[in-house]
Amino acid sequence: MTQDELKEVILAVIREIAPEADLVRLEASAKFRDQFEFSSVDFLNFATRLQDRLGIPIPETDFIQLATLAGCLFYLTPKCIQKEG
């Protein structure tokens, strides 16, 4: 999976959790909770759906790394590569 494909998966999951989110103005380094008013339940659903969609286990202790688009890409890219390898 390329980084662009991974980004599309992440954005698709955001759309599911926050359909009103303006993804055109998404800032890669800004926290999702600040940009989309994610509640803690929304964030938990986001992380869980990413795990399901990607087939990659993400320990709860690592959820903090998924707080931004940049963090998601940094954390998930090597895991996707390892899974495919």
Listing of model-derived features with the role each one plays in the protein:
Residues 42:
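Two-component histidine kinase catalytic core, primarily the HATPase_c
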